């Protein structure tokens, strides 16, 4: 029974999180549902687990702009999974074109 509850949360999170693509075609997180949600995160543990993540204030048009949007609030640009379900912890990776 617990499996169905966890599976439902997973599906709700991936369905709710539509990837944000800018008008010029920049897609920071092209992986789609799994690690496809652009987020600004303040904690980064071992480059995989991030915490205190939130959506960027606007859709970034480039990797540089994505970094600048997140840096304005002291956070790092990341592509995350489960960030809507677990706001204090998400599995993340660096977005396309982001080096730091």
Swiss-Prot record:
Keywords assigned: Cell wall, Disulfide bond, Secreted, Signal
Subcellular location as annotated: Secreted; Secreted, Cell wall
SUPFAM superfamilies: Hydrophobin II, HfbII
Annotated CDD domains: hydrophobin_II (cd23508)
Effect of a null allele: Does not affect pathogenicity in a corn seedling infection assay nor the production of microconidia.
Disulfide bonds: 29-79, 40-70, 41-53, 80-92
InterPro entries: Cerato-ulmin_hydrophobin, Hydrophobin_sf
Signal sequence, start to end: 1-17
Principal place of residence: secreted
Pfam family membership, one: Hydrophobin_2
Entry superkingdom: Eukaryota
GO cellular component, one term: extracellular region
Protein's job: Aerial growth, conidiation, and dispersal of filamentous fungi in the environment rely upon a capability of their secreting small amphipathic proteins called hydrophobins (HPBs) with low sequence identity. Class I can self-assemble into an outermost layer of rodlet bundles on aerial cell surfaces, conferring cellular hydrophobicity that supports fungal growth, development and dispersal; whereas Class II form highly ordered films at water-air interfaces through intermolecular interactions but contribute nothing to the rodlet structure.
Family to which this protein belongs: Belongs to the cerato-ulmin hydrophobin family.
Protein name: Class II hydrophobin 4
Lineage of the organism: Eukaryota, Fungi, Dikarya, Ascomycota, Pezizomycotina
């Amino acid at each position: 029974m617990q499996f169905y509850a966890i599976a439902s949360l997973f599906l709700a999170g991936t369905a709710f999180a539509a990837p944000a693509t800018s008008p010029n075609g920049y897609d920071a997180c092209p992986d789609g549902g799994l690690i496809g949600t652009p987020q600004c995160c303040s904690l980064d543990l071992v480059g995989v687990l991030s915490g205190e993540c939130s959506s960027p204030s606007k859709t970034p048009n480039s990797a540089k702009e994505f970094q600048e949007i997140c840096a304005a609030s002291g956070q790092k640009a990341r592509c995350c999974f489960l960030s809507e379900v677990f706001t204090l912890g998400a599995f993340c990776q660096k977005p396309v074109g982001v080096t730091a």
